Amino acid sequence: MYPLEVGKVMAALGGARTVGSAPNTLVELAATVARGLPGEVVSALAANAAPDDVAARRRVAALVTSAASLKRRDRLSPVASERAERLARIVALARQALGDADEARLWLNAPHPLLGSARPIEVAATDLGARQVERVLHNIEYDLPV
């Protein structure tokens, strides 16, 4: 996750108010995720990833958990919480690498040739996919060949 700050990941999840705590370290964030994040983080994350596109927000929410699961439980399962944190980390890294929240949103939701013409936000739903997206973003951030 370095050099990405925990606070930036928290912002993508909706902040301390939405998460219900304010972790400042990776250890604290991991413990918060392991307990299960509140269901509200799904809509906050979706809004941060695609605020002006209802269909894209639905896609992002579906990457975390099903609508039926959200209706049944107030908290996400640990597995769904990990997915939410992973996607929030990618949203935060895209903002950092691209320097602009709007540019990051466009990049996350547009098919990318280095990701098999898939949308980066969708590729990042798996651990391996997130690593691929992180590599592309780090190359962008540090002006390396993409």
Q: Model features per residue range: what roles?
A:
Residues M1-V146:
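Non-transmembrane "mature" sequence context
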